[in-house]
Amino acid sequence: MRLSQYFLPLLKENPKEAEIVSHRFMLRAGMIRQQTSGIYSWLPLGKKVLDKVCKIIREEQERAGAIEILMPTIQSADLWRESGRYDDYGLEMLRIKDRQKRDLLYGPTNEEMVTDIFRSYVRSYKDLPLNLYHIQWKFRDEIRPRFGVMRAREFLMKDAYSFDLDYEGSKTSYNRMFVAYLRTFSRLGLKAIPMRADTGPIGGKLSHEFIILAETGESAIFCDKQFLELSVPNSSIDFSDKAVLDDTVKQWTSFYAATEEMHNEEEWARLSEENRLSARGIEVGHIFHFGTKYSAPMEAKVMGQDGKEHVVSMGSYGIGPSRLVAAAIEASHDEKGIIWPKSMAPFDFGIINMKPDDEKCTQACEFLYQGLKDAGFDPFLDDRNERPGSKFATMDLIGLPTQIIVGPNSIAHNEVEIKDRKTGAKKSLKVEDVLSQLSIL
């Protein structure tokens, strides 16, 4: 993409309404625009990042055996009355009536609807286990929406729901999603630590939230430093192997880890001083095992091998892609702007033409731009007739991992400068060597 043809509404000054780093940089980099309190439009640069996050989430959900569906944002209140949650959810849930005076709601979550889908079609234990997921916009009427998309009223969520014949089967499904989440966050360039969590209004007795470390995080966290050394399962992991899943989850839950709400001073005191890590973190995922909380009142049953009806055991698994984008910025930035992990960056490489009216500079930029595209990359060429300083500031702000700087002095020696956004390290390469060198990064 050429910046001269792109819609990138940058802001030079820090917006007054932005309280945290991610909100400030997302507004300044033209990723989002606030439409009203807690509700945002995603502009082209932000949408590209959001799409990349969703792509990796989908790949890992499907690797773990989940099947994608799409449920509507508007739900019938009758389903929520059936589960008993309609009155429990308070003012956060937006309740509406249609012209026929029927009670509807803008879904804050989808346990009831997916259970209704399941009970309408699934009759036999032979169809289990089953895991259905979707990625859809949700709405919760926060009292005080703040921090940009980190705590918005409308937000994008990936929700998965597992159905099993019994508790043991549903525990395996829970572990399967636990491991899928470890892989998802790792592929997004984030180190997520699973922590025992309160089940809240979702319900159930088992829950973990996944926290990434960030100095500006909203939660105080306490954990064993050994978490930082654990390796995430690679793509060869067998999600059908119960023993492998159990061992992986056991390894990742054997060390102490807790948010402030679940912190236990006695257990913390048993840790050696050198292994204690007290920091700030941001929740990026939450998984729940709630058994028959929804399936029992909604009569979601299957016929078992014994010829008897069994109420299915369920779990739900959430990741907020829109929140995840902001969390990644909180975890990786400097005073100049965003520093994207490669897997989340809106473009693979940024090319800066320092002097567009110089024929050799422009020829080199076109050669590199087209060569990268032909090699399957998605480059971003700043071909505007602007000052070099402005171009450097733009490229640092939007956070592309690798910058290719083409100026008249270096191009006179048939060279360009390669800059690593994270480290600031620079090196010179011959123009003809750039494509082969960047392809192995």
UniProtKB/Swiss-Prot annotation:
Keywords: Aminoacyl-tRNA synthetase, ATP-binding, Cytoplasm, Ligase, Nucleotide-binding, Protein biosynthesis. It is found in: Cytoplasm. CDD domains: ProRS_anticodon_short (cd00861), ProRS_core_prok (cd00779). Its main location: cytoplasm. GO terms for molecular function: ATP binding; proline-tRNA ligase activity. Signal peptide: none annotated. It catalyses: tRNA(Pro) + L-proline + ATP = L-prolyl-tRNA(Pro) + AMP + diphosphate. GO terms for biological process: prolyl-tRNA aminoacylation. PROSITE patterns: AA_TRNA_LIGASE_II. It comes from the Bacteria. Disulfide bonds: none annotated. Coiled coil: none annotated. One of its GO terms (cellular component) is cytosol. Its EC number is 6.1.1.15. Homodimer. Catalyzes the attachment of proline to tRNA(Pro) in a two-step reaction: proline is first activated by ATP to form Pro-AMP and then transferred to the acceptor end of tRNA(Pro). Belongs to the class-II aminoacyl-tRNA synthetase family. ProS type 2 subfamily. HAMAP family: Pro_tRNA_synth_type2. This is Proline--tRNA ligase. It comes from Bartonella tribocorum (strain CIP 105476 / IBS 506).
